[in-house]
From Swiss-Prot:
The active site is at D52, E124. Keywords: Cytoplasm, Endonuclease, Hydrolase, Magnesium, Metal-binding, mRNA processing, Nuclease, RNA-binding, rRNA processing, rRNA-binding, tRNA processing. This is Ribonuclease 3. Pfam families: dsrm (PF00035), Ribonucleas_3_3 (PF14622). InterPro entries: dsRBD_dom (IPR014720), RNase_III (IPR011907), RNase_III_dom (IPR000999), RNase_III_sf (IPR036389). SMART domains: DSRM (SM00358), RIBOc (SM00535). The keyword Zinc-finger does not apply. One of its GO terms (cellular component) is cytoplasm. It is an enzyme of class 3 (hydrolase). Belongs to the ribonuclease III family.
């Protein structure tokens, strides 16, 4: 699409009319289409960084309100599911971003408009663009519009991270993970537990929770996240 492309249809899908459309244009600009110096500044990469954090904040608030009985470990797993690359790429497709991407000739010919990693990055960049143009409330409305259905009906069942970690260790010929208590703090009526999980030859991971079980799950999640392992089934 040319730079004079009328973005009215896209803005209608997003539910936001830009006061400064340059934010939207930048969010759709891949590094391959930028020439000269400071290419990373004039592509969506900085917006992607901001959008990742804005998206995480809004989705965290949504989860906190939607699941009042959920403990922090479950909320963290749900958050990871909702902001993972595949989910963001699906949102980008729902937004209809592909045809609007500004790509270099090589990327355009290689099918980049359908590439999951690029679509996921652009979805986050668009969140940031709306945030910069209309503030947190506008960004929240955008996230609500495209992520709410995924929050209420998760596409993938969530798995216990302790089970996933044990399977991961077994597949690598390692013994079962060992969980050890590190610290107990707080009053008796609201204790906090810090737990570490150990596997031979690997750095331990620590996490806190309101119970030992919650802390163990959080520690397992932290370990898996560090190793790049996803805890949802179907991977």
């Amino acid at each position: 699409m040319s730079e004079t492309q009328d973005f009215a249809a896209l803005e209608a899908r997003l539910g936001h009319s830009f006061a400064d459309r340059s934010h939207l244009v930048l969010a759709l600009t891949h590094i391959s289409s930028v020439k000269g110096q400071a290419v990373r500044v004039r592509s969506y990469q900085r917006l992607e960084f901001l959008g990742d954090h804005v998206l995480g904040s809004v989705v965290s608030h949504m989860l906190y309100a939607a699941f009042p009985k959920a403990e922090e470990g479950e909320l963290s797993r749900r958050l990871a599911e909702l902001v993972r690359e595949e989910a963001c790429a699906e949102v980008a497709q729902d937004m209809g971003l592909g045809p609007y991407l500004r790509l270099g000739p090589g990327e355009a010919q290689s099918g980049a408009r359908q590439r999951r990693a690029i679509l996921a990055d652009v979805a986050e960049a668009v969140v940031a663009a709306v945030y910069l143009d209309g503030g947190y409330e506008a960004a929240s409305a955008l996230v609500e519009r495209f992520w709410r259905g995924r929050l209420e009906a998760p596409r993938r069942p969530l798995r216990d991270p302790k089970t996933v970690l044990q399977e991961w260790a077994q597949a690598r010929g390692l013994p079962p993970p060992v969980y050890r208590d590190v610290e107990r703090s707080g009053p008796d009526h609201a204790p906090r537990f810090r737990v570490a999980v150990d596997l031979p030859g690997l750095e331990c991971a620590e996490a806190e929770g309101g119970s030992k079980q919650t802390a163990q799950k959080a520690a397992a999640s932290a370990f898996l996240a560090r190793e790049g392992v996803v805890t949802e089934s179907g991977e």
